[in-house]
Swiss-Prot record:
It holds the Pfam family ubiquitin. This is Ubiquitin-ribosomal protein eS31y fusion protein. Ubiquitin is generally synthesized as a polyubiquitin precursor with tandem head to tail repeats. Often, there are one to three additional amino acids after the last repeat, removed in the mature protein. Alternatively, ubiquitin extension protein is synthesized as a single copy of ubiquitin fused to a ribosomal protein (either eL40 or eS31) or to an ubiquitin-related protein (either RUB1 or RUB2). Following translation, extension protein is cleaved from ubiquitin. Gene3D superfamilies: 6.20.50.150, Phosphatidylinositol 3-kinase Catalytic Subunit, Chain A, domain 1. One of its GO terms (biological process) is translation. There is a cross-link at residue 48 (Glycyl lysine isopeptide (Lys-Gly) (interchain with G-Cter in ubiquitin)). InterPro entries: Ribosomal_eS31, Ribosomal_eS31_euk-type_sf, Ribosomal_zn-bd, Ubiquitin-like_dom, Ubiquitin-like_domsf, Ubiquitin_CS, Ubiquitin_dom, Ubiquitin_ubiquitin-like.
Amino acid sequence: MQIFVKTLTGKTITLEVESSDTIDNVKAKIQDKEGIPPDQQRLIFAGKQLEDGRTLADYNIQKESTLHLVLRLRGGAKKRKKKTYTKPKKQKHKHKKVKLAVLQFYKVDDSTGKVTRLRKECPNADCGAGTFMANHFDRHYCGKCGLTYVYNQKA
């Protein structure tokens, strides 16, 4: 029987085969006509790749069927080397969650029940209300805008 093999270039080859022929035999015939080694050939029929040991009858290939020939690609991308680090990884800072942390900014007077601020609020308009200044040993400092008040030094 006669089958057709269509190559990637669009060229169609006709082969004289029997339904009992193996895929290996078909690839050998393609090598005789085209010079492509069988290990580089991949034959596709009805969307399936044909395995070498099977026969044409296994795939229900009848007379005047068309097989598609594609070339096998070898290799792929180069393997990348794994990076080796000289120093150990830096530990990330963990945020310390303090429950009821707001209580350290205010004090409630027991006798009068009056609330007083323990920290100084930043007067800058950019910071807004509720932005407290850090209390250092010699100054008050706003971390948001950088405003600093230095205490009077007694000589």
